[in-house]
């Protein structure tokens, strides 16, 4: 998957048809391997990114490359010295679907992802994270159970989450949840220009 992305190899089947997940530390393993021998600053609140002298200046330190992992709408406000104003109107108009991700414990099963369109509940997908790596389950998950993330489109209250979980198979037990309003940009004919 990483090779295909770097070398622009087109997927010949559906988007998740090729899948790799490391047994220890999950997808974090990939990030850690890519980060080896690089100077990476994590957990830093960046208020300004300036392009000067063919380098990126951030918090009084110069960098050759910057990977922006924030909301693209914020990028327009904080980047200086690199003209992205021609895209500003389109970026401001960009719409998103948010996702409420619910961390749960569920019955052990053989699946990685379960897409579950149903009129019985509002969830659209279960990601069986406990099946990707045993270390994802930790020592607290009882025998016959695994961890999972159950996703709901847009924001949903804890009360509604609990109510929905009671109608989903695999007997999900609520552990925690987090809402991200900027999960999926809504594409249109102009957003890929």
Which residue stretches match the model-derived regions?
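Secondary-structure boundary/capping positions in well-ordered alpha/beta enzyme cores
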Residues: 38-41, 82, 172
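A generic structural-conservation signal
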Residues: 42-44, 100, 174
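Mid-domain catalytic core of redox enzymes
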Residues: 47-164, 168
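Residue-level signal for pocket-adjacent positions within structured domains
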Residues: 14-16, 41, 86-89, 109-111, ...
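Short, glycine/charged-rich beta-strand-loop motifs at protein surfaces that mediate ligand recognition
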Residues: 23, 151-154, 179-185
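Flavin (FAD/FMN) cofactor-binding core of flavoprotein oxidoreductases
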Residues: 160-193
């Amino acid at each position: 998957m990483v090779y295909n992305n770097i070398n622009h190899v087109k997927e010949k089947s559906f988007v998740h048809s090729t899948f790799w997940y490391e047994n220890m530390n999950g997808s974090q393993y990939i990030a850690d391997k890519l980060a080896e021998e690089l100077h990476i600053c994590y957990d830093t609140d960046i208020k300004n990114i300036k392009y000067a002298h063919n380098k990126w200046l951030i918090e009084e330190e110069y960098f050759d490359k910057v990977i922006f992992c924030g909301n693209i709408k914020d990028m327009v406000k904080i980047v200086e010295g690199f003209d992205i104003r021609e895209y500003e109107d389109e970026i401001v108009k960009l719409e998103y679907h948010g996702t409420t991700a619910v961390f749960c414990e569920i019955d052990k099963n053989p699946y990685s992802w379960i897409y579950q369109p149903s009129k019985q509940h509002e969830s659209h997908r279960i990601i069986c994270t406990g099946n990707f790596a045993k270390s994802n389950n930790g020592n607290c998950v009882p025998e016959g159970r695994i961890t999972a993330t159950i996703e709901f489109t847009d924001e949903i209250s804890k009360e509604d989450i609990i109510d929905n979980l009671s109608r989903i198979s695999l007997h999900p037990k609520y552990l925690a949840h987090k809402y991200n309003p900027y999960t999926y940009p809504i594409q249109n004919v102009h957003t890929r220009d």
